[in-house]
Regions:
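Acceptor-substrate binding/catalytic loop of class I
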Residues: 175, 221-235
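Short alpha-helix
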Residues: 229-255
């Protein structure tokens, strides 16, 4: 990652969201109206690949993956907000645009946790597009590849005693299984009712043909740019890991299940694949590991005995 620039992973994910509005047919899966603007002067270059090769399995697969996971997460967030949840944590926020284009974002405190270089680039892109940063948005700079964001999040005012929705997308495959477990244990220390939505990659023997083709090509490209995939999980493994981390309600959602069935009746190249699965779990009893991290990082101004946030050890921007 270069100073003042986001990672290529963040750029390509944003380009896929932007291209969905340009090259794919109705019905749209997800409408990110700011993705193109956030790409800045890289927009033409990155989106042109999709325009020229819309049906290529890697490009069509990327658009399918990023739009389905974003749609599912933001639909879940809307339901959580309707139940009174007021905190939204985006681990590895990248160029996520939720807080700048969504009407109900005004009732939420949004904590965008990411590498300072990505956040600097994003601030400049927002300014260039004349998009104001809402009062409820807090940028939490953290080198998520090396350090725990627990301290920065606590200092930013996250209330670990109140439930939140935690989005952790496009990250776990770049972490070891041990690091993923540490992250889940940390999130499991949040208040009961907290939800986490993350995606993970299936092992090769659990992928269908489309998932195998896309996974092989993208894993190779990721490794070549220095961001190799390091972990893969069977759904049962993720469920067991979650149960040990304080999560009661656990769902593993296949890509086909992430959006309404009617949206798969399409005339473009977007098709569901068995490669990435969405993990959606709810904290019922805070994990001991998470509680210990929370105690180690009380929020700014907290009195003795009050606890703060605990969250992911590492993430990719």
């Amino acid at each position: 990652m270069e100073n003042g620039q986001p990672s290529l992973t963040a750029l390509t994910a944003t380009a896929a969201r932007a291209a969905h509005l340009i090259v794919d047919h109705e019905p749209l899966i997800f409408a990110d109206s700011l993705a193109l603007a956030l790409l800045g002067d890289r927009a033409g270059e990155l989106v042109s690949y999709h325009e020229l090769h819309a049906a290529h399995p890697v490009l069509a697969g990327a658009r399918t993956q990023v739009t389905c996971r974003a749609r599912y997460t933001e639909d879940s967030l809307a339901r959580a907000a309707g139940r009174g949840v007021t905190q939204y944590v985006i681990l590895g926020a990248g160029l996520d645009s939720f807080a700048y284009r969504t009407p109900h974002a005004g009732g939420l405190r949004v904590f965008e946790v990411d590498h300072p270089a990505t956040q600097d680039w994003k601030r400049r892109a927002l300014a260039a597009a004349k998009v104001a940063v809402p009062d409820g948005v807090t940028f939490v700079p953290a080198d998520l590849a090396a350090d725990s964001p627990a301290g920065p999040l606590a200092a930013a005012g996250f209330d670990a005693a109140a439930p939140a929705l935690v989005s952790w997308l496009g990250v776990t495959m770049y972490l070891t299984q041990g690091a993923v477990g540490e992250t889940l244990a940390a999130i499991g220390g949040f208040a009961p009712g907290t939800e986490v939505i993350a995606d993970y990659m299936l092992p090769e023997d659990m992928r269908d043909e489309a998932g195998a083709v896309y996974g092989t090509l993208v894993a190779q490209a990721s490794a070549e740019r220095g961001e190799p995939w390091l972990s893969f999980f069977a759904p049962g493994e993720m469920t067991d890991l979650a149960r040990r981390s304080g999560f009661g309600s656990v769902r593993n959602v296949r890509q086909r299940q992430t959006i309404p069935a009617a949206l798969w009746r399409r005339a473009d190249a977007l098709r569901p694949a068995d490669l990435a699965v969405l993990f959606h779990a709810t904290v019922t009893a805070p994990s001991r590991a998470g509680e210990n991290l929370a105690k180690a990082h009380p929020p700014a101004g907290a009195k003795d005995g009050e606890t703060g946030v605990s969250t992911a050890r590492r993430a990719r921007c």
